[in-house]
């Protein structure tokens, strides 16, 4: 197994994986991912890396509050329930920070009503976990394309 690196704010930790999370294609664009399960983090990190993004792992809404204003944030992917909150709080923090960072929510229990609620509250999309990594990559790429089309003058934060 190869060693790969997940990036934590102000720190880094290594995780073993079959493929490296970073391939040098990210050009400084970051994706914040909020998850509490290490297996989920690994799966999402690899998918985001394949989208050309540098995955930055967070596990709490408090960590998000301190990181969201940093430059290069292109997209945010979050688990439905976190250690100190949930996706609704993540959406509020993202909206309050300004900018137009697309938020993709994933849930183990997602149903149609939850999907509609997440989108109504401002999520770009809500995926049921486990999902295929290709599905997540497609949603993230679509979110980035729509953000570029809607806000062409906005620099990535």
Where are the regions a protein language model picked out?
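Conserved phosphotransfer cores of two-component systems
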Residues: 69-71, 93-100, 121
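Non-catalytic signal-transmission and effector/linker regions of two-component phosphorelay proteins
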Residues: 1-47, 51, 141-157
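C-terminal output helix
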Residues: 131-140
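Acidic, metal-coordinating helix/loop segments flanking the phosphotransfer/catalytic sites
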Residues: 57-75, 82-85
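Conserved phosphotransfer microenvironments
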Residues: 41, 74-94
